[in-house]
């Protein structure tokens, strides 16, 4: 999605890595650790996302986000944005800091997500507690659930659209049409790879964890 936006004339900040993530990321990572202090772990796979919805956002958090986004916020480009996966961990306060921007919620089948590694695989790296496990796929699945629960608890912003990776790959023209109507400007057509779809059928991905089932059904994925 980031590459599509960049090729469509959206300034995505600078510099970017090969995945289209805005660099350097350290300020965003530190911001994630700050918001985690105010999300109590209830035990099991439950967290209390209530406090961060209404509390005053710490000045330190705002400073970190503004510093991370300095090239985006300071750009005169008519269309601006950014992408880095860890934004999701900060979503409640990002939504409140930037209530009028247009959000694109990029969703992927969690069974495919957990076949590969991500920086958020171990939530403890960002100060988030969860049941300890040596099973790397279970850790990844817990991280996916946490992030999905966090977004659901926070609710949609004023302007938001959900796009499933699978739909974008298999029905690119249809999904680009939805996005063009939502964003209000034409989007570039770039080649997309189909191999990320159904990866859990070809690579080790652990079991189908029961705690993922409700969210998979919510997003329209087969069980």
What are these regions (language model features)?
Residues 59-93:
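Glycine-rich phosphate-binding loop used to anchor ATP phosphates in small-molecule kinases
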């Amino acid at each position: 999605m980031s590459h599509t936006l960049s090729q469509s004339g959206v300034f995505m900040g600078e510099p970017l890595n090969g995945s289209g993530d805005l660099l350097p990321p350290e300020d965003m990572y530190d911001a994630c650790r700050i918001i985690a202090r105010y999300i109590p772990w209830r035990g099991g796979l439950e967290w209390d996302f209530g406090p961060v919805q209404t509390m005053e956002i710490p000045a330190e958090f705002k400073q970190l986000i503004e510093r991370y986004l300095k090239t985006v916020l300071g750009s005169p480009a008519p269309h601006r944005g950014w992408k880095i996966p860890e934004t999701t961990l900060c979503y409640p306060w990002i939504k409140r800091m930037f209530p009028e921007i247009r959000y694109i919620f990029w969703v992927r089948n969690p069974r495919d997500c957990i076949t590969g590694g991500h920086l958020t695989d171990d939530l403890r790296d960002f100060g988030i507690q969860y049941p300890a496990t040596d099973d790397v796929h279970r850790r990844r699945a817990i991280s996916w659930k946490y992030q999905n629960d966090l977004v659901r608890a926070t609710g949609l912003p004023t302007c938001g659209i959900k796009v499933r990776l699978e739909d974008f790959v298999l029905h690119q023209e249809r999904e680009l049409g939805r996005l063009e109507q939502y964003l209000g400007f034409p989007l570039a057509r770039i080649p997309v790879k189909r191999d990320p779809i159904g990866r859990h059928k070809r690579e080790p991905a652990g079991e189908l964890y029961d705690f993922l089932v409700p969210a998979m059904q919510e997003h329209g994925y087969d069980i």
